């Protein structure tokens, strides 16, 4: 009898301790489904949440899909702020490593959504992008030099949805 009571009390305690975590997760998920009114007027909009390594794609203010991504090795590597997609390229070469576009060794995969990023010092950079990968196991981790990596299948889908000038909000 005492053993059953102890098990029941233990189960109740575990449930009570788990509820706040579940509620926080549910609230965070719900928060991500609706785009802030400030940005809801855009036909396409991307939010990248570095704290969860997730990309959220919105159309007309409604969440369409979310994806796991990889972001910077250090928090400062992936810039934060409101940017725009400036170019869409299939099979972009990896200039740093002198690897041709379409090569399986290319760490950018076969799709590149290049961002126009205003850096903290006020200069503009076109070196950051949302792209595929040659290392699918890296997705969900903090491993990049600053770009946003996606599974190749996911970035192909996103590439077909977005247009040049689509806003991209990158946040903690």
Residue spans of the language-model regions?
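Bacterial N-terminal signal peptides that target proteins for export
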Residues: 1-9
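Exported/periplasmic cell-wall-interacting domains
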Residues: 25-28, 34-41, 73-80, 89-172
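Structural motif
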Residues: 52-54, 82, 112
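Bacterial N-terminal signal peptides
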Residues: 8-18
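Sec/Tat signal peptide C-region and signal peptidase I cleavage site
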Residues: 19-23
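Well-ordered beta-strand positions in beta-sheet-rich domains
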Residues: 45, 66-68, 82-84, 127, ...
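Conserved strand-loop elements at the edges of beta-sheets that form or border functional pockets
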Residues: 48-50, 87, 141
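A structural motif detector for short, solvent-exposed N-terminal "entry" segments of globular domains
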Residues: 32-74
